From Swiss-Prot:
One of its GO terms (biological process) is translation. Belongs to the universal ribosomal protein uL24 family. InterPro entries: KOW, Rib_uL2_dom2, Ribosomal_uL24, Ribosomal_uL24_CS, Ribosomal_uL24_KOW, Translation_prot_SH3-like_sf. GO terms for cellular component: ribonucleoprotein complex; ribosome. Pfam families: KOW (PF00467), ribosomal_L24 (PF17136). PROSITE patterns: RIBOSOMAL_L24 (PS01108). GO terms for molecular function: rRNA binding; structural constituent of ribosome. This is Large ribosomal subunit protein uL24. Keywords: Ribonucleoprotein, Ribosomal protein, RNA-binding, rRNA-binding. One of two assembly initiator proteins, it binds directly to the 5'-end of the 23S rRNA, where it nucleates assembly of the 50S subunit. One of the proteins that surrounds the polypeptide exit tunnel on the outside of the subunit. The keyword RNA-binding applies. Part of the 50S ribosomal subunit.
Length: 109
């Protein structure tokens, strides 16, 4: 299993495939499959039968895409960037954008 550098809530851009160029936030991460669900990307229409809980109909939902098809958005420039890990002076480990050196987020829960 690969260590993922993406977390829920990260801003990403799709860099390849049918949805190339679309931006969105990560809604859910599937580390065992190396896939993520990005808001507004890879939308499909699903037909549901009526049941006791809902009336049924056609719903639109996002499907997972592979993490190799996305890149983080640099918070400083807005361009796609790779992510590196860096230890700060206080001992905490953070994720930083390689292009600008801007901090993306802390590592851990």
């Amino acid at each position: 299993m690969v260590k993922l550098k993406v977390r829920k809530g990260d801003e990403v851009i799709v860099i390849t495939g049918k949805h190339k160029g679309k931006k969105g936030k990560i809604l859910k991460v599937f580390p065992e499959d190396s896939k993520v669900i990005v808001a507004g990307v890879n939308l499909v229409k699903k037909h549901t039968k009526p049941n006791q809980m809902s009336g049924g109909g056609i719903i639109t939902k996002e499907l997972p895409i592979h993490i190799s098809n996305i890149a983080h958005i640099d918070p400083k420039t807005g361009d796609p960037t790779k992510v590196a890990f860096k230890c700060l002076d206080d001992g905490s480990k953070v994720r930083v954008a390689k292009k600008s050196g801007e901090i993306i987020g802390k590592v851990g829960k």
